[in-house]
Amino acid sequence: MQLLAVGLNHTTAPVSLREKVAFPADQLGQAVASARVWYGRSDSKTYSDEAAILSTCNRTELYAASHQPGGVNEAIDLTAHFLADYHKLPYSELRPYLYALPQDNAVRHAFRVASGLDSMVLGEPQILGQMKDAVRQAEAAGGLGTYLHQMFQRTFAVAKEVRSNTEIGAHSVSMAAASVRLSQRIFDTISEQNVLFIGAGEMIELCATHFAAQNPKSLTIANRTLERGETLAHRFNGRAIRLADLPDQLASYDIVISSTASSLPIIGLGMVERAIKARRHKPMFMVDLAVPRDIETEIGRLDDVFLYTVDDLGTFVQTGLENRQAAVTQAEAIIETRVQSFMHWIDARAVVPVIQDLHESSEMMRMIELERARKLLAKGEDIDAVLEALSKGLTAKFLHGPQQALNNAQGDERTRLAALLPQLFRTKR
């Protein structure tokens, strides 16, 4: 069985590329189905048996399993062509940024990702939920088989073990906390600022929690669905507005945090230019936590706008890394043990067909001898004599194959079989 993880993440590709290959959450199932069709129609049919796609703001990865052999470079090429075709991008733009991890390295990578060891925010918990969602969608799309299903179940168990037995998530600085710290570099006190959150998902909820603790002058949630926005805003004594109202109200806000699932930018250059003019060039602090990005990159060039992306926040979230190094070492040790256990399971799975054949062959021998014994009993033969014949017949049939193989073998092959057979049959020799 061939296992593989192919993708790009925040360490190999800039956000400008990651946003182009991100899959919206509601399209993951369709993407998995498309990936399996894509690999299946290739000449080698490499990695077409099982597939799952993980897509977050920091990574897009495809996990695959196949009985067909295939090289790492071939797998990278196939994945690059698939991503390029699916997202309508040039192949040459993607290929240099992709990595491929085969076999135990793929398993180790999945375990590390789910445990938060491969995240921009070391130990952050959101990635585990995102991976579980990705696996559910892959399963619904028919992408999971025996191997990926088992790998991901063990992945989730390892992540739980790491978080329960180490302090990997302790003292970490989250994206939400980093956003607050950055804003405090621009404004002396957040208590005098109006804060706007665009979106109503988990990341916005985390950010709102951190900013609300600073007692801002006002807190507003802008969302496509007003009811959902109002529900979140009520928790923080804020108010909600529709996204459609954003162009007219943007000028009222000093701090803007955006994280939606939109495939296109929500805030454009013209909108912000008009807002800055209405604010009489009072500074505006903006954080775009979305991938694809919610805020057009050109906005960052405006003199009175301080725009940060998820990559810009990377330096802040490394705070406390040295203090957590011991936890990282502990987590890596747990992961390594579980990787070896899973690879042993895969090796054991390789002999399952052989064991099944042995059972089927033995069952056929048993049925033949049993039928013969029944016929003898029906004729009135002595029961002890029939049982004796039955046992001898079964013994002869079971030993016929090994004896024939040993007699037909020559040289080193005979020596090898002669040493192996006593182990298989547990004889005294």
UniProtKB/Swiss-Prot annotation:
Subunit structure: Homodimer.
Site location (Important for activity): 109
Name of the gene encoding the protein in the UniProt record: hemA
Annotated family: Belongs to the glutamyl-tRNA reductase family.
Lineage summary: Bacteria, Pseudomonadati, Pseudomonadota, Betaproteobacteria, Burkholderiales
HAMAP family (UniProt xref): Glu_tRNA_reductase
Protein name (record): Glutamyl-tRNA reductase
Known EC number: 1.2.1.70
Reactions catalysed, as given in the entry: (S)-4-amino-5-oxopentanoate + tRNA(Glu) + NADP(+) = L-glutamyl-tRNA(Glu) + NADPH + H(+)
Active-site residue list: 57
Binding site for substrate: 56-59, 119, 124-126, 130
Annotated metabolic or biological route of this protein: Porphyrin-containing compound metabolism; protoporphyrin-IX biosynthesis; 5-aminolevulinate from L-glutamyl-tRNA(Glu): step 1/2
Broad EC category: oxidoreductase
